[in-house]
């Protein structure tokens, strides 16, 4: 098992270095990043299910912990997008709210990082981490929420609505994934 962990970690490291070579967003970079993530996941599963684990129940629990974390991070994006689409559908200012997404660039990536940090802090037994994650996000986004340089078709209210609804949906998803797992 040690050899498998070392090989997977080495492959992930090589791919990480090679991924810096292509231009940002290139197909090769995306493929390398995906394979690198798969190597990291396989390494984590091997480590969590391997030596030092007391019995099959603990091994499966560790794997479930990791899979649930992946669901918290990856599943929250489509859910948040769907909730925002539902909000926009019933909104008379739909165009303004949709264009607010252009003001809040990087929201999908920030949301994934946010969900990962929240899931990790809850599973680690440190729920105070939620407050820290939300404070960092709020402070980082504050200039965009209050900027007078927004396009004329986007109101500050629409940007704030999108930020609040997206954040709450994202956080509730991560908390739900962690809470259901820990409710056993």
Question: Which stretches of residues belong to each language-model region?
Answer:
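Multi-pass alpha-helical transmembrane bundle typical of ion/small-solute transporters
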Residues: 1-130, 135-184
